[in-house]
Amino acid sequence: HGSTKWCPSPDAAQKYACCHHGMATYVLGSENEMPWKFDRAYKSDITHVMDEMKLHYTDKYHVEYKISDMTGAEVTDIKLESSVVFEPGLGKYGEGRAWIEPVTSAVRIRKNLNDLSGDELILRNYIKQMTKDGSYQQIAAFHGLPAQCPSEDGTTVHTCCLHGMPTFPHWHRLYVALVEDELLSRGSRSGRPYWDWIDPFDRLPDFFNDATYYNSRTLHIESNPFFRGSMSFANTLTDRDAQDVIYNNH
């Protein structure tokens, strides 16, 4: 965050310790999930910050952090120890010393849902197959309801998602892989698409907001499985109530 280097003020009249913002991490959760736990620092790539400050990882600098809740109030009762880990790059220098990034993607490429081709939109058909045989609901239950994970003392049953725990990234990686393996077994050639909701938008994507879609295989207009789903344990359908605050919000 800071270093022994000094940066001039805009008018060059004073000098300040150089300070660059490195990263921000959000921890989610709800009253239905397992207890919120934050007992270690999250790992994040700060290579770009080191480059901007022209720092080598062995140089003298220090890292500062601030923990706040979603209202902006600072959380002061959690003390974490930060550290910097150097991991050599996996790429290589090519012709003209141009850096070549390594190929790390698998056969199943996860694309932005706004960039899906017409052929890839057939993903709806595979999801519909999963909803019909119950496999989609089984996987969804591992993330949400019905709650299946008991507390340590056995008095409470929580939903199994780990949003408020440091192990969440690992859990979610396995969860996405579980969905993609199910799609692959049904003939899907693409990975599970993602919605980049960080980009400002004025309406929900048609991919999951349209109630129906044209199925090019059956040549019929059919219900969109991403629009509404069945919850057999509650004998009801899912509903969506998008709040205006999400639109055009940076």
From Swiss-Prot:
Question: Does the record's keyword annotation contain Transferase?
Answer: no
Region entry Unit D, spans: 107-250
> According to the record, how does the cofactor bind?
Binds 2 copper ions per heterodimer.
Give the intrachain disulfide bonds: 7-18, 149-160
Placement of covalent cross-link 2'-(S-cysteinyl)-histidine (Cys-His)? 19-21, 161-163
Q: Which stretches of sequence are listed as region Unit C?
A: 1-106
Q: Which UniProt keywords apply?
A: Copper, Disulfide bond, Metal-binding, Oxygen transport, Repeat, Thioether bond, Transport
The residues that hold Cu cation are: 1, 21, 143, 172
GO MF annotation: an example: metal ion binding
Q: Where are the transmembrane segments?
A: none
The cofactors required by this protein are:
Cu(2+)
Family to which the UniProt record says this protein belongs: Belongs to the tyrosinase family. Hemocyanin subfamily.
Q: Which PANTHER family match?
A: SHKT DOMAIN-CONTAINING PROTEIN, TYROSINASE FAMILY MEMBER
Its biological purpose is as follows: Hemocyanins are copper-containing oxygen carriers occurring freely dissolved in the hemolymph of many mollusks and arthropods.
Assembly, in brief, is:
Decamers of large identical subunits (390 kDa), each containing 8 globular oxygen-binding functional units.
- What protein does this entry describe? Hemocyanin, units C and D
